[in-house]
Amino acid sequence: MLHATRPSRTNYRRPYRAARLAAVLAMAAFSVASAHAWVLTITAGPKAVFLQVGIGSYSGTYQSGGTPLNNAQVNVVSVTVPASAVGSGTAQTMTSDSTQSVSFYDNFVVCNPPAQVYIGGWVRTPAGTGTGVLSVTSPATLTSGTTTIPFSQISWTSTANGNTTPDIPAGSFNGGTLTLRNIAAGNWVENCHTFAYANTTVVAAGTYTGRVTYTLSLP
């Protein structure tokens, strides 16, 4: 099994916009006091998967013959909730320290950081058959000392510049492993996720942190 934990444009919808690597997105962060998606085509080749969450590395672009590089950087998504708004039920939009805006497929500007986090990957097999599974695993809670916030308070919307289809769907963390989508061999799928904190619980002041891990596996 290949297992990755971690980050001419031809799409089913429009033209010119397909080893083992790891990426982790660290969700941190409560100091309490257009977007569109792409499914692109890649050629068959040796069995491999590539996954990028936030900042990633590639030797050039896929279209220019580039190949994936490992990038161990962990990006942080955060929000500071004003004391007057804590537990109000008004969702708080989160931002990221990721600066990744372009796709390594062809340097197309897919995402708009810091509001959006790039998430994308590809699956390749010699015969172009088989399917990879993209999933995300979260702990039950974010913590600040002995105080906690359910990780399910964090959700995301999905979109990307140039295509309105959420090919990596919107959702919320579930305190376990959540399957996001299947990726067929020969496809590069990418999206931009915008995260939000539901803010429905009154909690003590503090910085609440936790980490989620995105995984792309191919049997």
Summary of predicted features, one role per range:
Residues 3, 31-34:
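Short, contiguous, well-ordered secondary-structure segments
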Residues 157-159, 198-199:
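Short beta-strand segments and strand-loop junctions that repeat across beta-rich extracellular domains
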